[in-house]
């Protein structure tokens, strides 16, 4: 019997304009009315999820930042974290600078970027499609490295947007050799960097252990590379028609 449904957001639960259809909303409400836990599982922080998800009655837990934070909505705290130390974050930011990337840092449930680059979003081909969203949701700081160092805590995720499309496979190959991190992509031309072993599947595993729910009683649905680990973990999985996680190479991103 299904006790928990883990749902990717972009491309799965949400429509292209970042909202949930009435049909999907009603289906989730019906599942929750029957006692099933509905858990958003996303590369975003909880704060950056659209309000139609955050404010959905009955949402108790969320897997955020690709599993780096498992958030208890009602208690307003993380019940599990898998974070990167400053040294790893600084290394990833230096790496991104080598390829003139637009970097983002996810820390304590918020997304940060460099103030000096915020007005240059349109220069990044893949990022330019989300320029208005980025400018309205990212918190700008003078120096990401200094900000992380001063924060004195681990980082959930580093998100790199390459300026040149041809740099993506080169960067991907180099990062695959780094044993300190796990990498994935949500299909938008970005490279999402987490602590080694951190992914949506790991976050879902720890949530299930916390709730004492067997994986056989879990359903997961997703459509992209970063959904693969949780689809493999769940007893029942629903892969959307545009699923990319089985792609042999990131060259088409």
Task: Name each model-derived stretch.
Residues 3-16:
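Asp-based phosphoryl-transfer active-site loop
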Residues 22-126:
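Active-site phosphate-binding/coordination module
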Residues 245-250:
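Conserved small/polar residues in nucleotide/adenosyl-binding loops
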Residues 31, 66, 204, 230-231:
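Hydrophobic residues within well-ordered alpha-helices
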Residues 43, 219-224, 239-240:
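Glycine-rich beta-to-alpha transition loops that act as phosphate-gripper elements at the mouths
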Residues 95, 106-221, 225-227:
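Conserved acidic, metal-coordinating active-site core of Asp-based
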Residues 35-39, 59-60, 157, 216-217, ...:
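Short active-site oxyanion
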